[in-house]
């Protein structure tokens, strides 16, 4: 995958993604090893994408779903020939054929393997499904059902990480293929925090028990993981609102995002953490709070200065 970005460079333009390694290292230091191929349940076979990295962790998880000869696959890794060869040999050894290809979203570490799939399995030409499809692909709509022997899969449109992001619910297991919305380890980058949090609640409302993420290990307690994600986001919102309240108490009308980071975290952090992680993350939360009409900004000397409206 070029630059090991996996599509993330488009998510937050203020984030210097190439210099983000210190933050990512904290999420990837203690990752468990995952086998290249693992039968997770009688209905779910995981094939690792052979693309490990800072953003993909152990690699993109691709899932073969069903119990019969004809099964569907969720995601296709990033175009690594090693994945295509591993998938082909695995399916051949099990006498399995593919009938549908379901893509969670547009990022390259999920869609890059499609050309290899079509080269190996040309019968799939009209069976590549994605929300907001590209040329030659079929659309996925919210609530759409895909059936193969032993598996009923329901599509769920849950944007936030990306506008087109779909999760897929395996009805027989009360399990969800969570894509990049919920990861097996750490937390996901998002395009729109408000939309993402609404999607988290919608995912929680499905009452699924287990999560099969696109990156990392199986999520044994999916509701707990989603609640933790929501709680962490809400805690950051509260932290920012409290800091803006202190600014107002000092009779200071407004504050830049850079000064707000100092207000919250102090002066002692290293500059790379401040500018490459905390500042863009704080800006992301401020934009969400502005959408909730809890904060606003004025522009002075060409810079946004934020204040609480509560």
UniProtKB/Swiss-Prot annotation:
EC numbers on record: 3.1.2.-
Family per similarity comment: Belongs to the metallo-beta-lactamase superfamily.
Enzyme class per UniProt: hydrolase
Binding annotation for Zn(2+) 1: 105, 107
Induction of the gene: Expression starts 10 days after infection and shows an increase towards the late stages of infection which correlates with the formation of the sclerotia and thus the pigment production. Is directly regulated by the cluster-specific activator CPUR_05433.
Domain of life where this protein originates: Eukaryota
Annotated active site: 109 (proton donor/acceptor)
Protein's job: Atrochrysone carboxyl ACP thioesterase; part of the ergochrome gene cluster responsible for the typical purple-black color of the ergot sclerotia. The ergochrome gene cluster produces several ergot pigments including the yellow ergochrome secalonic acid and its derivatives, as well as the red anthraquinones endocrocin and clavorubin. The pathway begins with the synthesis of atrochrysone thioester by the polyketide synthase (PKS) CPUR_05437. The atrochrysone carboxyl ACP thioesterase CPUR_05436 then breaks the thioester bond and releases the atrochrysone carboxylic acid from CPUR_05437.
Protein name: Atrochrysone carboxyl ACP thioesterase CPUR_05436
Pathway named in the protein's UniProt entry: Pigment biosynthesis
Gene Ontology terms describing biological process: secondary metabolite biosynthetic process
UniProt cross-references to SUPFAM superfamilies, sorted A to Z: Metallo-hydrolase/oxidoreductase
Stored InterPro entries: LACTB2-like_MBL-fold, Metallo-B-lactamas, RibonucZ/Hydroxyglut_hydro, Sec-metab_biosynth-thioest, WH-like_DNA-bd_sf
Sites where the protein binds Zn(2+) 2: 109-110
GO molecular function per UniProt: hydrolase activity; metal ion binding
Cofactor dependence: Zn(2+)
Gene3D superfamilies: Ribonuclease Z/Hydroxyacylglutathione hydrolase-like, Winged helix-like DNA-binding domain superfamily/Winged helix DNA-binding domain
Keyword terms: Hydrolase, Metal-binding, Zinc
Cofactor, free-text remark: Binds 2 Zn(2+) ions per subunit.
Catalysis: reaction(s): atrochrysone carboxyl-[ACP] + H2O = atrochrysone carboxylate + holo-[ACP] + H(+)
PANTHER family reported in the protein's UniProt record: ATROCHRYSONE CARBOXYL ACP THIOESTERASE, ENDORIBONUCLEASE LACTB2
